[in-house]
């Protein structure tokens, strides 16, 4: 039995294989030579992700920093939202002393505080506050989620910097606290 040869089909197949090979080589060159979005804490870098469980005043839930970011944000966009991250420890004396001021700033920039006419006191973009509660290397100190809750809510019988968390400065906070007891987030942001 004689084999049938179709030279047109053979030429088309060879051409298709060559075009596909060039396409894949081009994709590989692009992948190797293109820089990804730089991640870090420097100017122009994308912030490292914050991960973990977060306490919002009622329950611990999964925290996703991406939900706070605007993907198509541009400089000067008055409608864009900002994200302010505070790394703190519930037993750090400075953190306890500045808790009142931090809460006031959060209420103002998150547009919770209102003017007499009911409009937000802050006229700029919304600034979302997030506290990443870590455990610093303070001798004789161990933190817990109960202590984080008591610090945020200004309640409970937990101790913050050797006194009751309920006695710290300011009112209860209205922003999210992330459990970073293991310091993973803090290390990413150094």
Where are these regions (language model features)?
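Structural microenvironment flanking redox-active thiols in thiol-disulfide oxidoreductases
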Residues: 96-170, 180-188
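Cys/His/Pro-rich metal-binding microdomains
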Residues: 48, 93-96
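Extracytoplasmic
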Residues: 47, 78-80, 124
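A short beta-strand-turn-helix
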Residues: 51-83, 111
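Secretory targeting signatures
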Residues: 1-46
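Short pre-active-site segment immediately N-terminal to redox-active cysteine/selenocysteine motifs
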Residues: 80-83, 88-91, 136
